[in-house]
Amino acid sequence: MSNQMRKLAGQTMVYGISTVLVRLLNYLLVPYLTRVMERAQYGVVSHIYAVIPFVLVILTMGLESGYFRFAGKASGEGEKRRVFATAWGMVSLVSVLFFVLVLLFNGTIAEWMGYAAHPSYIWMTGAIVALDAVTAIPFARLREQSRSGRYVLLRLVSVVVNLALCFFFYGWLPSLAGRGILPWAYDPAMGPGYVFVANLAASAVTLLLILPMCGGVAPRIDRRLARSLLVYSLPLLLSGIAGTANEFIDRQMVLWLTPGGSEYALEQLGVYGAVIKLGVVMTLFTSMYRLAAEPFFLAEFKGDDFRRTNAEAMKYFIIVSIFIFLFIALFRDLFALILGRDFREGVWILPIVLLSNMLSGIVLNLSFWYKQTGATKYAIYVTGTGLLFTVAFNILLVPSLGYVGAAVARLVCESAMVALSYLLNRRYCPVPYDLKRIGEYVLLGALLYGAGVLCGSLTGWLRYLI
């Protein structure tokens, strides 16, 4: 393992431990909410939360990657501060304008999304997204400066606030209100709305805590620098919109295309959303790798160091991903116990979900060359192609297969993006990936998984032993 690879691995471990801790705390909400909510109510949460990342991508405008690249090329600390102030200023301005529009058209948006009886869901979601967008660039600065401790602390505080409030609203508040304590604070008609109240409070606390960590730099837009940042980042914005749609439009299409009425569609969406949560370990690994790899690969490299390091990183990423896939897929019946009983029927699609998450990480690795070289237009080609596959296969499969069709459609989408990303890489910036060795790892993983399935699953043997 090269020195640069050791550095990346070390950064990944730092973010990994913290990300796992934060996500595991947040993940406690899944078994809790799937027990205190009906399937249709959890479907509402899954539906609205599927929209949040999409809007967040628009508001941040690809400027996180833009900040990493321009800060990496900056000649001094003063120039870095100017890059930070400009990127933060643009995102903050757009976020404020967005929230004003949400307030002005709150009722219309609520009616369009099917929540006319609960317009508060919409303005609270708008506030959550705006606050998260405003903190995105300061969080990126903490990563660029390798201040992982403060990054982790803020994320941890946010999750703890969210978690504590959800437990309070759904566990303690109904009982307190029934005894005449805080009766004004509890409204049974809010249903899943208290999830958004808790998230909004957590996002507000995060903003208040991160402001003192910005080193006295205020949002301020340098027009000349802003133009350069936008030229680099806007293709990533368009790519991010398509990429987020690839990740989350399947939930919306399950809601639209599942036959049997809106209530049944929400129930199916609730099951699908819960099963996707079971793939959290693979998602965690990809997330912690991205947190470390993005600022790492967008910094300046000498000669062919970037290509060699990227090839080595891909190999190790795939090795770890295969281990994670085997662990969760072969023990999926045990992982299913995390969910409420009504949500376990869809657990058999978990291997498909895991493969999709693994391919998503491979696409991430294949994207660094065009971000490093400034050829960000290719991001649009890749994610746009993926979106076409997503929409086409969801339309084709969901009406007959329901959420199973959505899972298969996402797998096809990620496969197509991997193929196109690799072809573009070979043509414009050939990275010497060790395909022979990677193929051997994949084949070994497939054989081990097949052996586990043929043996009747490892969890079946465990049940007999226990």
Which residues are covered by each model-predicted region?
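Interhelical loop/hinge segments that connect adjacent transmembrane helices in multipass membrane
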Residues: M1-Q4, L8, A177-Y194, L207-E247, ...
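Transmembrane helical elements of multi-pass membrane transporters/channels
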Residues: Q11-N26, V195-I210, C214, R223-P295, ...
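Hydrophobic alpha-helical transmembrane segments
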Residues: W123, V152-G215, G384-F389, Y403-L424
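Signature of the first transmembrane helix
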Residues: Q4-F68, S92-L103, G126-I128, L163, ...
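Transmembrane alpha-helical segments of multi-pass transport proteins
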Residues: E111, P188-G191, G243, G386, ...
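Interfacial/gating helices of multi-pass transporter permease domains
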Residues: Y32-F54, P119-S120, P188-P192, S228-Y232, ...
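Specific pore-lining/lateral-gate transmembrane helices of multi-pass inner-membrane transport
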Residues: K73-G89, V271-T383
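Membrane-interface junctions at transmembrane-helix termini in multi-pass inner-membrane proteins
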Residues: L131-L154, C214-V217, L354-T385
